[in-house]
A protein has these predicted regions:
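N-terminal active-site segment of His-dependent metallophosphoesterases
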Residues: 1-58, 75
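Active-site neighborhood of divalent metal-dependent phosphoester bond hydrolases
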Residues: 49-56, 61-119
């Protein structure tokens, strides 16, 4: 068995698809498959790129069909922390919303949140 380790896609679905084709994956029935290899996605699917949701959909379909495995990266972890409150402590979000750090965090996640809202 051959494994292709792929990380830091950051919402660049078109580049991901080009890479998969270059590695020998073929799109059949809506997902990419390889005749003998498995893709191992090591996170950072979102932030920065223009097609973050499509990137997640490509990876999800591959995992669902058994042609890939995936783990969450720090960018996905940060997005979850942005939306999650700490009920055991202050009730604040796990990732700051206020102050200079909050402005940075909001900017980092805004493109993805906007893309989700447009669906």
């Amino acid at each position: 068995m051959t494994f292709h380790i792929i990380g830091d896609i950051h919402g660049h679905a078109e580049k991901l698809e080009a890479l998969l084709r270059k590695l020998g994956y073929v799109q059949t029935r809506g997902t990419y498959r390889h005749p003998y290899a498995t893709a191992i996605f090591v996170g950072d699917f979102i932030d920065r790129g223009p097609h973050q949701l499509e990137t997640l959909n490509i990876v999800r379909r591959m995992v669902d069909m058994g042609s890939a495995q995936a783990v969450m990266g720090n960018h996905e972890f940060n997005a979850i922390a942005w939306q999650t409150t700490d009920h055991d402590a202050t009730g604040e979000y796990l990732r700051p919303h206020g102050g200079p750090k909050g402005t940075h965090n909001r900017y980092q996640h805004q493109a993805f949140l906007t893309e989700l809202q447009n669906q």
